[in-house]
UniProtKB/Swiss-Prot annotation:
GO BP terms in the entry: DNA recombination; double-strand break repair
GO cellular component, one term: bacterial nucleoid
SUPFAM superfamilies: ArfGap/RecO-like zinc finger, Nucleic acid-binding proteins
PANTHER family xrefs: DNA REPAIR PROTEIN RECO
Known role: Involved in DNA repair and RecF pathway recombination.
Lineage top rank: taxon: Bacteria
Family: Belongs to the RecO family.
Pfam families tied to this protein: RecO_C, RecO_N
Family matches, as InterPro entries: ARFGAP/RecO (IPR037278), DNA_rep/recomb_RecO_N (IPR022572), NA-bd_OB-fold (IPR012340), RecO (IPR003717), RecO_C (IPR042242)
Protein name: DNA repair protein RecO
Amino acid sequence: MSGRTYRVTGINLKGIPLGEADRIVTILTREQGLIRAVAKGSRKQPSKLGGRMEPFVINDLLMVRGRWSAQTETSQRLQRIVQAETLQTFPRLSRSLAHLTAAQYLAEVALLLALPDQAQEELFVVLVEHLERIERAASEQAVLPLLTHGLYHLLALAGFAPQVQACYFCQGGLVGSVFFSPQWGGLICDPCRVAQRPSPIAWVSASALRALGSLPSSTLPLPEDSLPLAAWLEAERLLRRVLEHHTDREIRSAELLASCYAVPTANGQGSPAFPEGHPEKWASA
């Protein structure tokens, strides 16, 4: 191989058209972190690269280092994909909108956390592991806890994981009213809320507190149906606030996720299944 060619293993997270026949693919790789590469002719039929460039396909890739391009999404050099050998796909992610949306959600998170030109094997492994769990989920109801679990583990990998098993300030137990602040590192007991006055802050329901407390485990200890979907929606929403605080970016898939788990209201419209009385706005302490 020449000095400009190299091999990586990567999972496709995003693709955008380029011209009439090509595609720019954003790939999370074990060896080089996040790379953006041109898949020439991949939108033509037939094409050796076509199906291999779809989202959530893991390939062994032969790459050519590109030259500087002012048209790329960032200031990275644009690479070129020469060959791709598929190692793994996730066909069952398309079994429902919830499965696919959860996968897209975690892909968005990985895109926010990944770094270019740096080996990020652990991020690659954690993302793939949680995509496999979501793909195996037997029902849409089972997807949401797995998504929330994956979100927490990605936050932990980036050093952003909030405190979810004790009060952030006093490290004491969580009894009575419990609150959550993304800026202040997670759960806060009521006495510390009064003393420290963190802001913004949200009240946490008892069921969401249980959901949050289960997340640091490598696998979810709770049966998938032991908590209402509202608890997992609430937990996901709180963790998403942490991600947004640290990255200053929103997760576009979150709105679609909420619609997947909407419950009918009296007028027949859907609304997110938050528990009765849960505040919809974050308040000052």
